Amino acid sequence: MKTWDAIIVGGGVIGLSLARRLKSQGLDVLIVEKHEPAREATYAAGGMIASCDPHIPQELSLLVAASAKLYPEFVQELQDESGEAVDLRDAGTVAYFGSGEVSECAGARQLTDDVLSHIEPSLQLRGNAWFLPELCVDPRVLGRSLVQAAKHRGVDMVTGSPVIEVLAAGGGATGVRTTQSEYAAGLVVNCAGAWAGQIAPPSIPTRPVKGQMVCVVPHGGAPHSGPLIQHVVRTPEVYIIPRSDGRILLGATVEEAGFDKTVDPDTIRKLHQAGVDAVPAMAKMRIHDAWAGLRPGTPDNLPILGETSLRGYYAVTGHYRDGILLAPITAQLMAELITGCKPALDLQPFSPLRFG
């Protein structure tokens, strides 16, 4: 039986990014994915690189800033390796804060009503609006590009094969058992997102947090002039994400609903109405589709990054709503840790061992 240097459990944006990074450092890498790569939380995500969000936990601030800085180069590499154009937009975000809230993000500025009307004439909301110098990306294209880039670098993949157990001998990980087979490796990395805690031994406390979204499109297809709005818009009720082809995404709920991915029509109507309240011209667009995804939550709402109590078994999960944002820096830091280098940023606050 072939033995790999590393097995990555889970082929989402985190697993793919890490696999690609480890392969570039000379490791022989296998991704084992329960369904198809980049088709769960990655596929369902909005793709905001919300690096200026004032509600980012303090413990994450350095990782968030570093990852956002890496994004343009990260995307350029993926485009070069995959041959697919990734829709990375840099128009920025218009965010509505609570009374008295301010942004301390470099380059952020408060918007007057006149300036807001000039930069987004279709946006009718007024209030404590700020411009934030953030990026956004189409995660579905990003996921496809990551799959192709990983294959380009020589990462092996097994799909349609859920991992049920991490194999161990002599106090260390030796591979994984799936519902269909076994695979051997010198180390195992659990990047299974919301499903990470379902893999035995059950020492990774993740849970699914449901999010529903809806996509609207112009009647008759996308306008030649591009999207109706240029900026991502974040209000207390909804976030509105334009794509370069004219689609607009509206999201997203935060629901403790287990592994249920049912789309609720009333919820979708409320999201759509919140979008129309902000951008009335959106009422002339039609609903294209709606979906639900499962984010990986943790007890303290921080990612789980590091080696578990089983030698050679690493957890890289629990990114909650920030998996797309944190993918580049997570891949860099965990590749450094796994290959015996000192990570450029401190990962101790995210250690799996913090849960006892």
Regions found by a protein language model. Give the residues of each.
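N-terminal Rossmann-like FAD-binding beta1-loop-alpha1 element of flavoenzymes
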Residues: W4-I31
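Active-site substrate-recognition segment that forms the wall
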Residues: R20-S24, G47-I49, E84-R89, G172, ...
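Glycine-rich FAD pyrophosphate-binding loop
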Residues: K23-A45
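Dinucleotide-binding Rossmann-like beta1-alpha1 core, especially the glycine-rich loop
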Residues: G47-I119, L125-G127, A274-V276
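Helix-loop-beta segment of a Rossmann-like dinucleotide-binding subdomain
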Residues: E84-A95, G107-R153, T253-G258, G312, ...
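Helical element adjacent to the flavin cofactor pocket in flavoenzyme catalytic cores
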Residues: W130-T179, Y183-L187, C191
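C-terminal catalytic lobe of FAD-dependent flavoproteins
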Residues: P139, V279-G356
